[in-house]
Amino acid sequence: FVAFAAQLTLIESVDIRLLSTSMKTIKSKIGDATSLPYQNNSVNALSSLSVIEHIGLGRYGDEIDYDGMQKAIDEMKRVLAFNGMILVAFPVGKKNKVVFNAHRICTPEKVYMMFNGLKLIDEKYALSDKIISKKEYDKLDRPYSYGCYYFTKLK
């Protein structure tokens, strides 16, 4: 995804580890998702694809912090420019839970709560072989799938 997007625009990646790439349109900086190095309302587009569910669990060298995921979401909301977009994807299931040393799974309702203050533009659910709507997802009997969400910040 990042390499594809970098063909269209400059990408700035923030991670606890420096990203090594030869692509000139990807700039990497070391940082913490719970304390982003940007001013309020300054970033037009943010994405977190299979990242925020890990924050605070220590799996990738970060500090243990039960509220790490929410802190990262709050930081994304803080730096997002008005009318900007946040694209996020992470495990979504029927129950909220932490899978030890792996990831968090959130219900769709918890997702809406965590991103309160932003407007939900679209949501889809990724299965291994297709992308489905919320209505279709609600009919499934699966422990979890990947929720894909598009939010914006209104004035």
Specify the residue positions occupied by each region the protein language model found.
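Class I SAM-dependent methyltransferase SAM/SAH-binding core
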Residues: 1-35
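A short acidic, Gly/Pro-enriched loop at the edge of an enzyme's catalytic core
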Residues: 34-47
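A conserved beta-strand element that flanks and buttresses the S-adenosyl-L-methionine
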Residues: 47, 52, 56
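Short, flexible/disordered intra-domain loops and linkers
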Residues: 57-69, 97-103
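A short glycine-rich, Lys/Arg-flanked "PGG" loop and its adjoining helix->strand segment in the class I
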Residues: 64-85
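Acidic carboxylate diad motif detector
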Residues: 88-90
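Short alpha-helix
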Residues: 102-124
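Core SAM-dependent methyltransferase catalytic element
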Residues: 134-155
